[in-house]
């Protein structure tokens, strides 16, 4: 018996943020994506957001959105994964998506962006501009996706300078200043968080040069969540969402977009030399076209073990599950016990094996 799915004329979208867009660069990017939805679809889309949702309150908030008749719910943080799973068990027909890399559950679709593509290009820029072989990288949470970004940056730097070494520091260690640690090593080209919260005056984000407290921004990744949200909402409006679910009934659905869909981009400072800018444009163009893949072997870890053989390209799943550091990275992955309280909660859910193992 045939079952017909009539696409809706309008879509009501609800967003959950664990922090305010004014206080969190992460939530700010998602808020820009929500507003892009409204700009793109006009009266065909209605959106609402709930900010500063605590992890323990997320299930109740999702339940309220379902009761209020929202068609799709975007839980825009990995900390909401458990709440999404529980609500999907109660409401199997609800459209609930979690922004994470590891939501391998049939009823919960996950979504994320391939920021590693931009990190590879930023690594190349850093190596081109650094006067020394050491380049700084400040990471936050040792969760899946973080080693991917670190290694992409390291490989991009190594492509330009074979002697390049990435000095890895963590911002979530109590009582530790990654900036001071890098300054002590005389490291001045640094990759840090991708964006500063709107209310903060700090310019220490993206790729920057720091000398005697003076920061010069060089380049930064753009997380264009609007492109991803637009694609998902359009699939609902056209009826493709239901078709995707039927065709993938036995496996989890994940959305993982990058430069090819303009979901990831790069902004460069006018300070970049013309030749360096040409390199950036070339890499961006080739990655966007699928003609250049950042993760092609040989790739060796810090212990000298070959993880990827020569001329072999990693699959998306292998990229997501990466839990080692490339051979030209100086530093280590901290354990969950070493992290501050905020980081412990997220890492306990999505931490890589090196961080969560006993």
Residue ranges and their predicted role:
Residues 2-358:
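A residue-level marker of the well-folded mature domains of exported/periplasmic proteins
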């Amino acid at each position: 018996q045939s079952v017909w799915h009539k696409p809706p004329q309008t879509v009501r979208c609800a967003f959950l943020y664990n922090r305010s867009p004014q206080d969190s660069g992460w939530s700010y990017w998602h808020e820009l994506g929500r507003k892009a939805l409204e700009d793109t679809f006009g009266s065909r889309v209605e959106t609402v957001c709930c900010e500063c949702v605590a992890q323990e309150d997320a299930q109740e908030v999702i339940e309220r959105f379902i009761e209020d008749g929202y068609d799709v719910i975007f839980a825009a943080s990995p900390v909401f994964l458990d709440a999404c799973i529980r609500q999907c068990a109660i409401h199997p027909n609800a459209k609930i998506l979690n922004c994470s890399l590891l939501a391998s559950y049939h009823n919960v679709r996950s979504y994320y962006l391939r920021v590693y593509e931009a990190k590879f290009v930023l690594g190349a820029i850093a190596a081109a501009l650094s006067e020394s072989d050491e380049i700084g990288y400040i990471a936050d949470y040792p969760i899946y996706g973080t080693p991917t970004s670190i290694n992409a940056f390291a490989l991009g730097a190594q492509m330009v300078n074979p002697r390049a070494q990435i000095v890895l520091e963590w911002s979530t260690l109590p009582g530790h200043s990654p900036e001071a640690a890098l300054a002590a090593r005389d490291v001045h080209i640094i990759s840090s968080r991708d964006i500063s919260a709107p209310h903060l005056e700090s310019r220490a984000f993206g790729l920057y040069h720091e000398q005697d407290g003076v920061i010069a921004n060089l380049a930064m990744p753009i997380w264009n969540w609007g492109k991803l949200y637009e694609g998902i909402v359009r699939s609902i409006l056209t009826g493709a969402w239901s078709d995707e679910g039927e065709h993938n009934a036995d496996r989890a659905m994940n959305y993982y977009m990058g430069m090819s869909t303009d979901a990831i981009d790069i902004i460069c400072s006018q300070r970049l030399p013309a030749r360096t800018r040409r390199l950036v444009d070339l890499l961006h163009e080739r990655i966007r076209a699928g003609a250049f893949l950042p993760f092609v072997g040989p790739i060796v870890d810090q212990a000298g073990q070959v993880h990827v053989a020569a001329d072999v390209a990693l699959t998306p799943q292998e990229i997501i599950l990466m839990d080692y550091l490339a051979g030209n990275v100086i530093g280590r992955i901290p354990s969950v016990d070493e992290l501050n309280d905020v980081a412990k909660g997220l890492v306990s859910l999505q931490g890589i094996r090196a961080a969560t193992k006993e």
